[in-house]
Design a protein with these regions (language model features):
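Conserved catalytic-site loops of classical short-chain dehydrogenases/reductases
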Residues: 16, 107-108, 131
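Canonical Rossmann dinucleotide-binding motif of NAD(H)/NADP(H)-dependent dehydrogenases/reductases
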Residues: 4-50
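Substrate-binding pocket helix/loop in short-chain dehydrogenase/reductase
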Residues: 120-122, 126-133
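Glycine-rich phosphate-binding loop signature in dinucleotide/nucleotide-binding domains
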Residues: 99-104
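A short helix-to-beta-strand connector/capping loop
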Residues: 67-80
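Glycine-rich phosphate-binding loop and adjoining beta1-alpha1-beta2 segment
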Residues: 47-68
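The beta1-alpha1 cofactor-binding region of Rossmann-like NAD(H)/NADP(H)-dependent oxidoreductases
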Residues: 60, 82-95, 127
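Conserved NAD(P)H cofactor-binding loop of Rossmann-fold oxidoreductase domains
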Residues: 112-118
């Protein structure tokens, strides 16, 4: 975290936002990260492109996705990215630890990641399926 003073145009200046699921330019995570950057935030963008590669829409270029987010950063804001598979119980705390190490802390967390494509109907979903998300 920085000591920069937020302005009405950039109310997230000096804040760090972690956004999970920033792996493709057509995704919600990308849109959220771009908007947070527009508002002055420094960002840790999490992605896991192997998941998208398994989907019918396919994977996007992670670097192109991150470059697109970088284009929204205001002067002084920074972007850090981490690839992590949240099926590994050690991954979520490691992502937060990296935000603290690289950006000084976490002011907001947007949990956008999800597992797609294997749920079936609502009547078939059980607790294990929900935990997988």
């Amino acid at each position: 975290m920085t000591t920069a003073t937020p302005s009405p145009a950039n109310p997230l200046t000096g804040r760090t936002v972690v956004v999970t699921g920033v792996s493709r330019r057509a995704g919600i995570g990308h849109a959220i990260a771009c908007r947070a950057a527009d508002l002055g935030a420094s960002l840790l963008c999490h992605h896991f492109s192997p998941h998208d590669a398994e989907q019918p829409w396919g994977a996007d270029s992670v670097e192109a996705t991150l470059d697109s987010v970088r284009a929204h950063l205001v002067p002084g804001a920074r972007l850090v990215d981490v690839e992590a598979d949240f099926r590994d119980p050690a991954a979520p705390p490691a992502v937060i630890d990296e935000a603290v190490r690289a950006l000084g802390g976490v002011d907001a967390l947007v949990c956008n990641q999800a597992s797609s494509g294997r749920d079936g109907g609502l009547e078939q979903i059980d607790a294990a399926d929900l935990d997988h998300h």
